Amino acid sequence: MSKPAVKSVPSATAKTATRAANPRQKAKAPKQAKPEGKGRAKPSKDKPRAEIKKALHPRNAHLNGYDFPALISAFPRLKTFVRPTPYGALSVNFADPLAVKTLNAALLKHHYGIGSWNIPEGALCPPIPGRVDYVHYVADLLAEGDKSCAMDKARVLDIGTGANGIYPILGCQVYGWQYVASDINAHSLANVQSIIEQNPVLQGRISLRLQPDDKAVFKGIIQAEERFELTLCNPPFHASMAEASEGTKRKVNNLQLNRGSSVKAAPKLNFGGQAAELWCQGGEGQFLATMIRESQMFADQCLWFTSLVSKQENLKPCYQALAQLNVDTVKTIEMQQGNKITRVLAWSFQSAAKRKLWRAEHLAR
């Protein structure tokens, strides 16, 4: 299995480990570089890899694709949407929102023990393999090769959980994490609450909080004396509803062309998500800038801040902002699912020594 490309960035850490050890299995611990000192933005000598293998995280349950017979057995309603492809394999029409939602429900039931999952029309329907990849990589980030790290003691904050609640669901079921999930949309949180109530395995493990200020990220959510080992976020991608609609149309067109047909009707936005899930003023770049600025206020309450970054051009401004905040360590993890590349940007105000002490105090077995 090839390793994911992990690039060090202008930060206090010269190199990053490609993969941290899974606390539940034996693995070779990565070498840790000594911090170069807070506040520095020395360019790394690491060279980016020329090629990123088209593979999911080694612990990803979807590494070898979808087992449709098993999924249909677990969730019979999926059978209606499964068709053979021209190449002889089984698949669903990924341009059909109902087909994608039904596939997600089957995946969550078969692989993660979630018996009931649903989202309202218009809500973002997340690709499960890519979402759980993020969860696995930040689990590695948290462990840093420490085999004594008790993952089920970790407290995690999900910023912008949406109506699907996918990161809390996956984090709870894969690693036993305790979650706080926030959103600016009360209707989205109500749907996540309904999912929790219908699945006893999630009850008592996910706390929902409404963000009263749509311009804030952590403020109003993280409470005094509260600690989190990780924060996760999938920021709104677009800067306007018009841009979001165009992105949805383009995505559906590409899917239809891949299937050898053309779009005969306007694509439904429920393929892409609700307004707050899709766009915000200033788009992804502005959202990340706000997140980075606010993270300094909670530097001693969160061990690792992380976020997905979809647009590569947004990385440089993030690095520059982090370099001005006395951040100790910055890491960028590149993930690839098929032809799509996404990145996890992670930063910590704690030194490697302090992170080790944090794990010993809060995550010891």
Swiss-Prot record:
Name of the gene: rlmF
Q: Which species is this UniProt entry from?
A: Shewanella baltica (strain OS195)
* Function description: Specifically methylates the adenine in position 1618 of 23S rRNA.
Q: Which UniProt keywords apply?
A: Cytoplasm, Methyltransferase, rRNA processing, S-adenosyl-L-methionine, Transferase
The record's similarity note reads:
Belongs to the methyltransferase superfamily. METTL16/RlmF family.
Kinase in keyword set? no
Q: What is this protein called?
A: Ribosomal RNA large subunit methyltransferase F
Domain of life of the organism encoding this protein: Bacteria
Q: What InterPro entries does the record tag this protein with?
A: METTL16/RlmF, rRNA_lsu_MeTfrase_F, SAM-dependent_MTases_sf
- Which NCBIfam families does the record associate with it? PRK11727.1
Gene Ontology molecular function: 23S rRNA (adenine(1618)-N(6))-methyltransferase activity
- Tell me, which GO biological process terms does this entry list? rRNA base methylation
Location relative to the cell: Cytoplasm
GO CC term (a single one): cytoplasm
Spans annotated as Disordered:
1-50
What catalytic activity is recorded? adenosine(1618) in 23S rRNA + S-adenosyl-L-methionine = N(6)-methyladenosine(1618) in 23S rRNA + S-adenosyl-L-homocysteine + H(+)
Q: Where is the composition biased (Basic and acidic residues)?
A: 33-50
Methyltransferase recorded as keyword: yes
Question: Do you know which SUPFAM superfamilies this protein is assigned to?
Answer: S-adenosyl-L-methionine-dependent methyltransferases (SSF53335)
Enzyme Commission number(s): 2.1.1.181
